[in-house]
Amino acid sequence: MKFKEDGIGVSDLLKLIPDELLLDLAAETKVDYQVKKLYGQNVFNLLLYGLLSNERVGLRSLEDFYNSRKFKFLFKLPGTAKSAKYNSLSARLATMNVSYFEKAYQAIYEQCSQLYDEPTLSLKYKITRVDSTMVCQTANKLEQGINVGRKKDGKKQIKYTISLTDMFPSSVEVFTQQNYISENLTIPKAILKVIDKRKDNVFVFDRGVSSREAFCELDKNDCSFVTRLHVDTRHVVLQDLKPAEKPIVRNLTIIKDQMVYLYKTGAKIVEHPFRLIQTTNEKGTKYWFLTNQVDLSSEEIIMIYKHRWDIEVFFRFIKQELNFSHFISVNENGIKILLYMTLILAMLILIYKKINEFGYKTAKRRFAMELEYIIDDYMIEQCGGDPNTHFW
């Protein structure tokens, strides 16, 4: 059953994760080496189904589903143990080869971006928004974590830095060490790891990155970027660029468009040219934009930055609808596995949402319902019945 006959169904999307892919990755990464139960493919299917749950999924609820007739009927592999305890699941998540899930995520991203992605603004370039989000947990539960601020509330935080290329998450980094609280370290690292290496990829991030070394490193690696710069940042003007044909972009008026050198500290100048666009809004508030792109118009630069907000919407989606703020595993290995599985499920739901024209909540709910219909029909057929004779 499909909720939209002219739309896309869950069965179509599940074809993006063929059994052959998971079996090949298991052999490549040796994720099942010396494993007698809880094979990689079992854990993959268990987490994918568990994350669709409306409630906060935990190790005990995963244990219940693993031991259910439905899971055994659908996903049991030869040699799989008949049952599993929550502590066995916890231990397996702590020691599994993360690269199995990382490579699965990368392969599924490639499929999704080739088949379903659409450029946000123009066919001339892709937009990759890069930002970080923090998730906290009580300190005695997390093996590692970051302390933020001076507040001693007994909690630590995990930092996730994610790149969102047009519609899909194209890279991710997990940080648990205190020195990575700075965006000057985390965002460039995530950018350099992006799966989509095309030259027409423009990265956009906020003012959290201010390091001149970070700007230079991105430029030297041919990474086009657009960011905000603190107003009145000291700089040396090298060249005034041609005035914009349309000096008003949305609520901003372009005042200056220049090639500049930026100051570092004191009187030290970083002799690396960047483009600085100065604007003001109707209230006179200043907004400065920095980029290494000279081929795009000032209007395009500003419009690219305005799409940075899309990643905030994505963070809200995975936190509210996919329980991303809830830790199933509290060690770094398990946290990374859950992250990759969350991103895989998010990509499937985003396609389902866009093509069927649903909202986020409706897309997630109907995706889960449609998957249940598929499972029910399959079980009826395997037991010799005809699902079409029933009222659903």
Model-derived segments and spans:
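Major-groove recognition helix of helix-turn-helix-like DNA-binding domains
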Residues: 75-98
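Active-site-proximal, Lys/Arg-enriched surface segment
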Residues: 90-164
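Single, function-defining residue in the core of a domain
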Residues: 1-59, 123-124, 137-140, 152-392
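Short, surface-exposed loop/turn segments at secondary-structure junctions
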Residues: 74-79, 327-331
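Short, conserved beta-strand segments within well-ordered enzyme catalytic domains
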Residues: 47, 63, 83, 88-90, ...
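DNA-recognition alpha helix
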Residues: 57-78
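Conformational gate/switch positions in structured elements
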Residues: 82-86, 132, 207, 313
